[in-house]
Amino acid sequence: MNTRLLSITRILTRALPRSEIVIRRTVQQPVTFPSTRLQCRYQSTMETAKTAADQLANPAKKLKIEQKTIGTHNGAFHADEALAVYLLRLTPTYKDSPVVRSRDPPTLEACDIIVDVTGVCDHTKHFDHHQRTFTETFSEKHVTRLSSAGLIYKYFGKEIISLKTGIEETDPRVEILYQKLYSEFIEAIDANDNGISAFPSSAGAPAFSEKGITLPSMVAGLNPRWNETITDEISNSQFEKASKLMGDVFVDKLDYYSKAWLPAREIVVDAVKKRFEIDPSGKILNLGISCPWKEHLFNVEEEEGIKGETLYTLYSDGKGWRIQAVSVTKDSFENRKGLPEKWRGVRDEDLSSLTGIDGCVFVHASGFIGGNKTYEGALEMAKRAVAE
C-alpha cells in the first residue's frame, strides 16, 4: 500500500471509529478494524483513496447505509395500512423507512416488504388480505379476519411491545400485552376494514351516527378531497398524517396498558395469593388501592382454577375504604353476591347502627358498593356480607 493511501486510511479509521473498513490487498488477508454494523469494502487503491478523501473533505457526511422500503397501494388509504406502516417503522429493520405507494407490480416488488396490496400473503415480504383464499385470524379464539394492520401486528407485535416497554420478548407480560392490544384495539381495525359490524343487523338502526368520531372515519377524512387537485405528493403527505394518527393512538394505548393496566394485574395476583390471610373464607380480596382490577380478577381466577369464588374486594379511595361486590362478568351489572338488602340506601350513623359496625359511610341502593372510614370497618362489612 502506498504511503499516501496508508496515511488517509489511518486518518479515516480514527475519524470513523464505529465503521468497519476492510482494505483488500493484492496478496495478504484483509485488514479489519473493529466496528458495529457498517462495512466498507474497497476494491481498488484509487477507489479507497477517493472515498477517504471525500470523507475528510466532508466530515459531516455519513457513509451511505442502504435503507429498506415499505410498499403499499396508492389512491384512497384506510386505517389498516396506515397503522401497518407505522407499526413496521417501530421495528429496527424498518425504522424511518420510506413508503412507496403504487399499484405497479414491478415497483412494489422492488420494496423490501409490501402491505395491503398484491393479493399475496407469505408472512415474510407480502402481507395482503384481499385475496378470496385468505381466512387468517389472530388466533383460534378470534373469528375476525385480519386486515393488513392485524397481519403486521400478529407477526411483529411482540417485537414492538418488547422494544417499546423494555420487557424481554419471552417475558409472560409481553404475551399479556400482545393479547390485550389486539382485543382492545387492533381487532376493531381488522373488523372495520373487512366490513364487519360490531352489532348484528337485528339490533336495528343506531340511535345516532358515530362515524365522525371513529379512527377509520378520521383516517378516511384525511384523503384528498374529490374536488381538489390531487397529486402524488399531496396524497402521500396525507397518508403520512393518517399513519401518524393511527400510530400515536397505538403507542398511547401500549403506554397505558404497560404502565397502568398491567401493574394492576400484579396487585390482583398478590391479593389472590393472600386472600386466606384476609378471611378464612377466601372470598374477600384486599387490593389496598383503587386500580383497574376487574378484568384481571376474572383472568387470574380462571388461571388459578377458582372461577367465581371471590365475592368482594376492598380498596382505599384516598379518604376511606370501599367494599365492592364482584360482578358476574367483567361487564355485567349483576353481582355474584350484592351487599345485604337491608343495608342498601342507608348512610352514615344510621348504617352503623343498623350493622353494628363503626365508621360506616354508605351502601349503594343497588348493593354493588359501600364505604367505611377505616379498613377494619370495611373488612367487617365484607365478612358480614359473606356470612349472610
For every predicted segment, state its role:
Residues 1-45:
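N-terminal mitochondrial targeting presequence
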Residues 4, 14, 58, 64, ...:
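Short, flexible coil/linker elements and helix-boundary hinge sites characteristic
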Residues 96-98, 170-171, 266-268, 304-306:
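Short amphipathic alpha-helical surface micro-motifs
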Residues 186-290:
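Hydrophobic, aromatic-enriched interface-forming segments
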Residues 266, 273-388:
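Gly/His-enriched, cation/cofactor- and phosphate-binding structural elements
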